């Protein structure tokens, strides 16, 4: 008996990465993930819950997540939704007034210093030496350490209120002046989160680079702390990775660097899902074919190494296609991978690109070991009906200039594999060995 849709949904639920992701994100970064997860329990047209219990569970989770922040109006609305009331308790109005007063107090405490930092004649006298800058501001403008620290405190307060652009600006101003390395490091993480939540991807990438450098230098003598901080950064970097195409290559370079590959394998192997998807989906956009092939080989290598530690339909598709060469299993896993992508916050928008690219890779691998391919069977394996399959394969052969032709009368694709004699293969391998020997000899001669 075929499995029901409900049992299939339940089996795929085990691949939900939300519980793993939230452990490595700030509460404000968790919120978009929770919000997206809760949307699946509501009707898109009526906005009425389709699953009342699940919808309430997600609302409760959002309330618990944000109740300690200063986002008082939103938290009050969540309370009303949970309790089924129109008016929140008086404590929320009291907290709102308290937050407004604190905002005004912070404004007053930093107004003098922020005004100074807006003046050209002051900025022109600042140098890269923070100690000298503080001495100049203290001597010429009566600026104190407490006033600088107030920028940091106000930035944190604005962040707690959900005013992310304001928080980013305050934390930047603090970082320009402060000599407190621990707070400067915390401010950089805070500014990174603020830029992510503001959707300022260029700014986020600048901060991500600073955080990465800080981890490498400041925590050099503490490998355990380095591993923990790199684990956090790996998760935070998923936001620009899937939201800013211009940042993708730089981030992939980071992910595939030895330090971060080691971090993923040691601490968070589930990140393999995101690496596999972004690499495969980038097949058509890759400017450098060599770099793309290397990234794909790296993904395959890590999937093979980490199979005992982590697997899901995405990594199982990669394993079936490139490690086991099991095309039936790859065919089975691709639609499952597509379903997993549709419920993953970071991968929802890239699902179609992934499936299309995965079909291309499936076709390429399949064609390498078959001389004549049945169109109907291949269409089924690609998850397409016969007409869609024929059209898709015709377009692929045309676009990639694949040396193949379609025999519509027989319903087959005929591959033109060039014959390569054993003699020719020996010559090619000997050439490669001779070249490597020359390189080694030259290296030894130096």
Curated annotation (Swiss-Prot):
Keywords: Cytoplasm, Initiation factor, Protein biosynthesis. Its main location: cytoplasm. Belongs to the eIF-3 subunit E family. GO terms for cellular component: eukaryotic 43S preinitiation complex; eukaryotic 48S preinitiation complex; eukaryotic translation initiation factor 3 complex, eIF3e. This is Eukaryotic translation initiation factor 3 subunit E. Residues 240-420 form the PCI domain. Component of the eukaryotic translation initiation factor 3 (eIF-3) complex. GO terms for molecular function: translation initiation factor activity. GO terms for biological process: formation of cytoplasmic translation initiation complex. It is found in: Cytoplasm. Disulfide bonds: none annotated. Pfam families: eIF3_N (PF09440), EIF3E_C (PF21357), PCI (PF01399). Component of the eukaryotic translation initiation factor 3 (eIF-3) complex, which is involved in protein synthesis of a specialized repertoire of mRNAs and, together with other initiation factors, stimulates binding of mRNA and methionyl-tRNAi to the 40S ribosome. The eIF-3 complex specifically targets and initiates translation of a subset of mRNAs involved in cell proliferation.
């Amino acid at each position: 008996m075929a499995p029901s849709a409900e049992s299939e949904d339940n089996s795929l639920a085990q691949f939900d990465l939300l519980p793993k992701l939230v452990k490595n994100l700030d509460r404000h970064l968790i919120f978009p993930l929770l919000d997206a997860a809760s949307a699946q329990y509501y009707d898109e047209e009526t906005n009425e819950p389709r699953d009342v219990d699940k919808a309430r569970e997600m609302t409760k989770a959002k309330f618990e997540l944000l109740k300690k922040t200063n986002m008082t109006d939103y938290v009050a609305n969540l309370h009303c939704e949970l309790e089924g009331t129109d008016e929140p308790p008086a404590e929320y109005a009291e907290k709102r007034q308290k937050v407004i007063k604190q905002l005004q107090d912070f404004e007053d405490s930093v107004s003098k210093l922020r005004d100074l930092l807006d003046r050209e004649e002051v900025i022109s006298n600042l140098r890269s030496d923070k100690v000298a800058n503080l001495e100049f501001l203290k001597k010429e403008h009566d600026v104190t350490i407490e006033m600088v620290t107030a920028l940091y405190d106000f930035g944190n307060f604005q962040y707690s209120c959900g005013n992310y652009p304001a928080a980013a600006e305050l934390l930047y101003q603090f970082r320009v002046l402060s000599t407190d390395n621990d707070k400067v490091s915390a401010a950089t993480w805070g500014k990174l989160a603020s830029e992510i939540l503001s959707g300022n991807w260029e700014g986020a990438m600048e901060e991500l680079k600073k955080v990465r450098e800080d981890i490498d230098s400041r925590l050099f003598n503490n490998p355990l702390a380095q591993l923990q901080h790199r684990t956090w950064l790996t998760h935070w970097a998923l936001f620009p990775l899937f939201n800013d195409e211009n940042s993708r290559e730089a981030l992939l370079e980071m992910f595939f660097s030895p330090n971060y590959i080691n971090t993923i394998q040691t601490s968070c192997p589930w990140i393999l899902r995101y690496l596999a998807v972004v690499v495969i989906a980038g097949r058509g956009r890759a400017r450098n074919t060599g770099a793309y092939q290397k990234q794909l080989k790296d993904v395959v290598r890590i999937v093979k190494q980490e199979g005992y530690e982590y697997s899901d339909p995405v990594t199982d598709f990669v394993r079936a296609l490139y490690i086991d060469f099991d095309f039936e299993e790859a065919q089975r896993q691709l639609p499952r991978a597509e379903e997993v992508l549709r419920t993953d916050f970071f991968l929802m928008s890239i699902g179609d690109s992934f499936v299309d690219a995965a079909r291309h890779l499936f076709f390429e691998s399949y064609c390498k070991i078959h001389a004549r391919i049945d169109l109907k069977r291949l269409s089924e394996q690609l998850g397409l009906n016969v007409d869609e399959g024929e059209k898709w394969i015709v377009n692929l052969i045309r676009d990639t200039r694949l040396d193949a032709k379609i025999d519509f009368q027989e319903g087959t694709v005929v591959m033109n594999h060039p014959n390569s004699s054993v003699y020719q293969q020996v010559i090619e391998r000997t050439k490669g060995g001779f070249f490597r020997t020359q390189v080694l000899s030259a290296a030894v001669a130096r």
